[in-house]
Amino acid sequence: MRAAFMTGVREVAVRDTEDPKLDPRGATLRVEACGICGTDARTFFNGDPRAPYPWILGHEPVGVLEEVGPDADLPADVRAGARVFLGSILTCGQCRYCSEGSQNLCEDHLLYGYDPFPGAFAEVAAVPPVATKNLIPLPPDLPPDLATVADPFACALNGIEVLDIGLGDTVLILGSGPIGCWQAVMARDRGAGKVYLSDVSKDRLDMALAAVGGSVDDAWVAGEDGAVAELMDRTAGRGAERISVAAPSQQAQQAALEMAAKRARVVYFAGLPKHDPVSALDMNQLHYKELAVLGAYGATQRQYRITMDYLSRRRDELAAVVTHRFPLGEIAHGFDTIRSGAGLKVVIEP
C-alpha cells in the first residue's frame, strides 16, 4: 500500500509500505477518505512527541471494513464489508467517566493516529482492538468526503451541548473554521435569538458565510481589540449570553470574557499549542460578571450517533464546509491549504 509518512517538521513522504497486519482482535480499513484535523496540522508544522518520525498521521478516516480478526469485538451493527467511520478517542471503557457515558474524558484515553497507533493517511489503516467499539456505520449514500466530518462535527456538537444555549440567547462564535461553521448551524437549530460569527481572517470568514451564512445574523473581522466593539454595538452594550471560542488564540480567550454578558456562559473549545498553553486572563471579568467559563473536548459515543443523523438531514449545508480535496500524493498541499487559510475543511482521498 501507499502511505504518507511525516519524516520531520513540515516534511512528508508518500511511499510504498507493507499493509498493516491484522490483529486477531482488530480489523483493517480500506480508506476512502481522511480529513486533515487542526491537530494533524499543528503536529505537521510543529512536531509532537506522540508522532515519532517517520509517522503516519490521520485520525478522521472513513472507509470499508476490509478484514476482521476472528476475535474482534465489533458493535452489533458493524460487520466486514461495512462502510464505517472511526471515532478518534480510544477509551478504556471501564473508568468512572466511560461508565457515565463521558468517554471523551476517559482517564486512560489515547488518540488514534498517534503513538502507538499509526493513522489513516494511507490506502489501508489498522483498526486496533481498543478502537473496534468506535466503528460506526455510515448511511449507504453518504459521500466519503462528507463522512470524514463525522468526528470533528461530533466534537463541535459536544461544545454546543456544553454551551447550553437557551431560547433567544445571543450566541457569538469566535473562529470561522469548520468547527465555528458547524456550531453556528447548531446554535440556530437550538433556538438562538442571534448568531454572530467573527474571525481574524476576512477570507476565511467569507468562505464560512458562503457555506453556512443562512444560520448567521451578522459577521465581522476581528480587529486589534478582538472584535469587542463590534459585538457591544450589536447588543446595546450588553454582550452575548453564550460564547464559543473555536480558535486556538489567547487573544480570543480574553476577548470572550470582555464580550460576555453578565452570567454568560463561555466555552473554550479550541486548545492552545502545547508549547504555549497559558493565557493571561482578566479574572475580574469572570468575578464581577459571574461568568461560567468551561472547556469542551472531544466527543462521546452518543454524540457520534447524533452526528450520523445530522449528516443525513443537513447534507448540503454541512458538505459546503468541505472546500478542498487532495489525493494522497498531494497531502503536503493539503497541509499548506490549512496553514494559509485558503480553505475550511480539507480532505485526503487515497
Task: Cite the ranges covered by each PLM segment.
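C-terminal hydrophobic helical "lid"/dimerization subdomain
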Residues: 1, 226, 254-258, 301-350
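N-terminal glycine-rich cofactor-binding segment
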Residues: 3-21, 38-67, 85-86, 106-116
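Glycine-rich beta-strand-centered segment in the early N-terminal region that forms part
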Residues: 20-34, 48-96, 139-141
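Mid-domain Rossmann-like dinucleotide-binding core that forms the NAD(H)/NADP(H) cofactor-binding site
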Residues: 81, 140-224
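NAD(P)H dinucleotide-binding glycine-rich loop of Rossmann-like/cofactor-binding domains
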Residues: 92-174
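Short amphipathic alpha-helix with an adjacent loop that forms part of the alpha/beta core around
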Residues: 226-237
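Glycine-rich phosphate-binding loop and adjacent beta-alpha segment
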Residues: 250-313, 350
